[in-house]
Structure formats: C-alpha cells, structure tokens
Amino acid sequence: MASLKSLFLLFLFFFTAQSRLTTNFYSKTCPRFLDIIRDTITNKQITNPTTAAAVIRLFFHDCFPNGCDASVLISSTAFNTAERDSSINLSLPGDGFDVIVRAKTALELACPNTVSCSDIISVATRDLLITVGGPYYDVFLGRRDSRTSKSSLLTDLLPLPSTPISKIIQQFESKGFTVQEMVALSGAHSIGFSHCKEFVGRVGRNNTGYNPRFAVALKKACANYPKDPTISVFNDIMTPNKFDNMYYQNLKKGLGLLESDHGLYSDPRTRYFVDLYAKNQDLFFKDFAKAMQKLSLFGIQTGRRGEIRRRCDAIN
C-alpha cells in the first residue's frame, strides 16, 4: 500500500510540475531563446560529433538523482565538494559542460538574468537528440536552478555500468519510473562511448553475455588500457553516431557493452521490451520521447524556489 501511495504522489508531482511550466515561458522575456540554443548546439555538434551523447548523459546525471536543477554544473569550492566532482561524475565529458556554458553566455548577452541553466540543459538535450536522428518532444520551461550541490547527496542514486539490473529497476521505480520507461531511457546508449575501465574486467569471463567475436575485439581494443585509461569503445558499434533502435538489436546478439546493457536482455522483466524496441523503432522513439519529457520534469524547482544563476557553474 505504501508503494502505491508513493507512486500516486509521484504521479501527482509530475502532473502539477507540468501544469506550472509552459512551452513558451520565454516568449516575451527572451524571444530568441530557442534560436540561440539551437545555433549554439548546432555549431558545437558540427565541430565535435560526440556532443549530443555528452549532453544527454549530463542531463540524466543532473535530473535522475534529485531533480532537474542544474546542480551537476556547479563547481566545487574549498568548502564544498560539488556533484560534478563525485566519483560517478568524473567521467562526464567536458563537451557537455562546454556547450551549456556557451549557450548560457550567449543568452546572458541577449537576455540577462532571465534563462535558467536547468532550462538550457533540457532544451539543449532535446535539440541535440534531434541532430543525431532522435525524436522531437515538447520541453516545458520555467525551471529554476538549485542553490546547492553536494557530492555526498549522490550516494547510490545513479546506476553504475556494473549495477545489477534488479537494483537498476529498484532505482528507477523509487523515482516513479516503470520498467518499460527504464528500458526506453536505456536507449540513450544508442550513441556515445564508454571507457574500457567500465567493462574490460568482464570481457573474457564465462557467462557474461558477450558474443565471442565481440569479446575478442574488445580485448584487442582495450589492450593498452592500463597505460592509457582514456581508451574507449562506442556503446553501439553498428551505428555509433546515429540515434536509432540498433542498440536493442545489438543486445539480442551479445553486442552490448556494459554489464547493465547485458542485464536488460538477461532479465525477463526487461527482455520483453528489448525485443519490442528491437523490432519497432517508431515505438521506441515514442516511448523514449515520453520518458525523456517525464524525466525533464522530475524534482524541478519553480516559483520562488531556487534561482536564475548568472553563471551555470556557480551559485549567485
């Protein structure tokens, strides 16, 4: 009964959060808001094609633990270790932070003290997703930025590449997300890359789910990893720069990269949805868009809560 009550309260939160936000929030205060973000992310994506994956990951690491409040952007100080310096966030690509800073700088010149960093992340994520072939979804605007960011508050809140699928399901359910929504959001691994340290320990072990030829290729790709920890492999080796449903097709063939990827196809609670999305890209796009929109509304601050940061990396 308690879990049902919690889910009801989460549903009520999402409904009321959406009702407080609007898609045209900046139409009068910053009419070029969308154009400025689109120009910024397009230029960045052209010069560095990994930007889309970097920002999508940044968005998840900001929103999932405690809500979409741009707390992951805040830099640490001598008195506080911020979220971005927690161990799980140290591998977040710099291009993700850079494009948000560029967008914020341009927006501050056009509309000072008006646009929140959390709104910038949400829109930039959606727009970058589109540049790599992903689906469109409406982004509701009016979020405010958090005044706090503490590494200690992230403990056990974000899934690791090695987290068992049962625990990942629990983590998502505790935030009000269903198993199907979790599987859909995992499709973000359709683009981007992972460092060898996140999976190389499992390669070559028995019963890990790797296609044998794929395991050999991964061993070869990561052979110099001890000397160069920056070596990485694409999450989707078939269409690494295109957002599509190939990720799910790969899982069925033993071509998943991370332990969490393999878990999606080994657990009967999630395998059904993997099969579904592997067969139907339109359905995957529809469900992914809905889940991303829902995630973008999670834990937001509005009204008098939070602030509009002048710089995304520092509290006013």
From Swiss-Prot:
Site positions (Transition state stabilizer): R57
SUPFAM superfamilies recorded: Heme-dependent peroxidases
Residue sites binding substrate per the record: P159
Disulfide bond annotation, renumbered to this chain: C30-C111, C63-C68, C117-C312, C196-C222
Biological processes annotated in GO: hydrogen peroxide catabolic process; response to oxidative stress
Signal peptide (UniProt feature, chain positions): 1-19
InterPro entries associated with the record: Haem_peroxidase (IPR002016), Haem_peroxidase_sf (IPR010255), Peroxidase_pln (IPR000823), Peroxidases_AS (IPR019794), Peroxidases_heam-ligand_BS (IPR019793), Secretory_peroxidase (IPR033905)
Cofactors (names): heme b; Ca(2+)
Residues at which Ca(2+) 2 binds: S190, D236, T239, D244
Class of enzymatic activity (EC top level): oxidoreductase
Gene Ontology annotations for the cellular component aspect, listed alphabetically: extracellular region; plant-type cell wall
Location of the protein in the cell: Secreted
Residues forming the catalytic site: H61 (proton acceptor)
The UniProt record lists the keyword Disulfide bond: yes
Ubl conjugation found in the keyword field: no
UniProt-annotated binding residues for heme b: H189
Catalytic activity: 2 a phenolic donor + H2O2 = 2 a phenolic radical donor + 2 H2O
Known glycosylation sites: N206
EC number, as in UniProt: 1.11.1.7
Function: Removal of H(2)O(2), oxidation of toxic reductants, biosynthesis and degradation of lignin, suberization, auxin catabolism, response to environmental stresses such as wounding, pathogen attack and oxidative stress. These functions might be dependent on each isozyme/isoform in each plant tissue.
Family under the similarity heading: Belongs to the peroxidase family. Classical plant (class III) peroxidase subfamily.
Note: There are 73 peroxidase genes in A.thaliana.
Record's protein name: Peroxidase 31
Organism field: Arabidopsis thaliana (Mouse-ear cress)
Gene field: PER31
